[in-house]
């Protein structure tokens, strides 16, 4: 063996083995009005049927229903790599006659996941924290409008500092190519005008592969992604393809000349899944955590925290309900105080043991 070789070059292999053994968690939210192909696209992206048991309400029922939050989980294994995918769906969004504040349940859900993670992170058992935070939100935009509607703007403005947003134009096969490009530019202009932050692709390093750089730039330019979903295999001439057949021809889901499906799947699965998780933790979650800590510094925050109805016993022995931010900080302080008392007790016990041992040695000498 080369005497100059230490072995640090094998560190990436260690990390790879550890990551493969542990597996990966990813939480994806889909939002947007009904009828834009959200369910079909998700099934197409992950080649699974997550909506097998869903019952589709009729038009009258949709206009009367309120927004609900549904979570569905599935484990996907490919090439020995396991991914635990959690899909957060928002049926009923934008379907009511009065859509005022219909986005608030989504905002609360995202914040509740941050709050749960903050409590778990501040607890005693930090090794087995379940990360239920939303790492990405696919927001579906209608191809039949002239850009973002007021409801779209209100929703995106409410969540853009809490989750990675990827705008998607659903059922893009309803548009001609020039119409698609015009709609994309209109949406980009509106996002800039409304100062809405969407997911920003990281800049490539100088030593990155040229093919990856090209793909990264292509994905940036294609935002918002114009997509078509289909799990049906049709024949286009002599070859089978996944797509949709119309009287005027066939739309191929995985043909980059027909839609942006491949770019969306490449970004979500192959190239940027880990970056979406890192941005969620390092930027979005840390921003939420900083706001929690700042709330303690405001006048009256201590008084508001003291009015919490949750006892210490319920805080440590039973699952916690979702609490206001000030109450969450009270629980954190209580846990810190409890840890400090336990440390003091341990130090006293050690001092008593040392004193007893010293007295025993002294009596032996006498």
From Swiss-Prot:
Full protein name: Septin-1
Entry function: Filament-forming cytoskeletal GTPase. May play a role in cytokinesis (Potential).
Xref: Pfam families: Septin
Region (Disordered): 347-366
Gene name in the database record: Septin1
Main localization, broad class: cytoplasm
CDD domains referenced in this protein's UniProt entry, alphabetically: CDC_Septin
Segments for region (G3 motif): 89-92
Region annotation (G1 motif) ranges: 32-39
Source superkingdom: Eukaryota
Residues covered by region (G4 motif): 170-173
Family indicated by similarity: Belongs to the TRAFAC class TrmE-Era-EngA-EngB-Septin-like GTPase superfamily. Septin GTPase family.
Subunit structure: Septins polymerize into heterooligomeric protein complexes that form filaments, and can associate with cellular membranes, actin filaments and microtubules. GTPase activity is required for filament formation. Interacts with AURKB.
Residue positions where Phosphoserine is found in the record: 206, 247, 306, 314
Domain Septin-type G as annotated: residue spans: 22-295
Residues at which GTP binds: 32-39, 66, 92, 171-179, 229, 244
Keyword Nucleotide-binding part of the UniProt annotation: yes
């Amino acid at each position: 063996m080369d005497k100059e070789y230490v072995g640090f070059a094998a560190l990436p292999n260690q990390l790879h083995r550890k990551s493969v053994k542990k597996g990966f968690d990813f939480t994806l939210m889909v939002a947007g009005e009904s009828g834009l192909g959200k369910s079909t696209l998700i099934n197409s992206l992950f080649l699974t049927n997550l909506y097998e048991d869903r019952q589709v309400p009729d038009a009258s029922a949709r206009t009367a229903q309120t927004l609900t939050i549904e979570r569905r989980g599935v484990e996907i294994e490919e090439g020995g790599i396991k991914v635990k995918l959690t899909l957060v769906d928002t049926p009923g969004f934008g379907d009511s006659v009065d859509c005022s504040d219909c986005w608030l349940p989504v905002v609360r859900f995202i914040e509740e996941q941050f709050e749960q993670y903050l409590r778990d992170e501040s607890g005693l058992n930090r090794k087995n924290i379940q990360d239920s935070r939303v790492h990405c939100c696919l927001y579906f935009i209608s191809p039949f409008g002239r850009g973002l509607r007021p409801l779209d703007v209100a929703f995106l403005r409410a969540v853009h500092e809490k989750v990675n947003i990827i705008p998607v134009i659903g059922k893009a096969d309803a548009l001609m190519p020039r119409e698609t490009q015009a709609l994309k530019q209109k949406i980009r202009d509106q996002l800039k005008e409304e100062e809405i932050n969407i997911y920003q692709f990281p800049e490539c390093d100088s030593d990155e592969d040229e093919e990856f750089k090209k793909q990264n730039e292509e994905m940036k330019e294609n935002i918002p992604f114009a997509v078509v979903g289909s799990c049906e295999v049709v024949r286009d001439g002599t070859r089978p393809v996944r797509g949709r057949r119309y009287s005027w021809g066939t739309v191929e889901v995985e043909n980059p000349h027909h839609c942006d499906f491949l770019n969306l799947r490449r970004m979500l699965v192959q190239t940027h899944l880990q970056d979406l998780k890192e941005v969620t933790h390092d930027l979005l979650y840390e921003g939420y955590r900083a706001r929690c800590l700042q709330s303690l510094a405001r006048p009256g925050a201590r008084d508001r925290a003291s009015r919490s109805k949750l006892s210490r016993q319920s805080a440590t022995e039973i699952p916690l309900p979702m609490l206001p931010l000030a109450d969450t900080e009270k629980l954190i302080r209580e846990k810190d105080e409890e840890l400090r008392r336990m440390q003091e007790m341990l130090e006293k016990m050690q001092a008593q043991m040392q004193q007893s041992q010293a007295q025993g040695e002294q009596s032996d000498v006498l």
